Amino acid sequence: MNRQIFKEIQTLKRQILPNEKVILFGSQARGDARADSDWDLLVLLNKDKRNFREDYDRYAYPFDELGLKHNALINAIVYTKKDWESRPSLLKYNVEREGIEIA
């Protein structure tokens, strides 16, 4: 894991999502990432309904820009907590099993 990228993800999370949950999952969280591995983030919003475009622009795109700065791919998936908790899926299973909450 690239510690510099991880620290900048933490800083960005505190700036744009101070009261929301962000979870790192995938190879970076498991500790088996290669130098070219992407960064998978789950963003859980404390609101009832998502506005896909607005939420992407506000909460996912800043992580895209951070990835560009470091020549890395950072994928932020945005859900409301309500939607995330109401739908079982393989993704949810993997996030719950291997995820690391970003403080």
Please identify what each model-predicted range represents.
Residues 39-44:
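Short beta-strand->loop micro-motif that forms the acidic, two-metal-ion catalytic signature
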Residues 1-21, 29-35, 46-103:
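Catalytic core of pol beta-like nucleotidyltransferases
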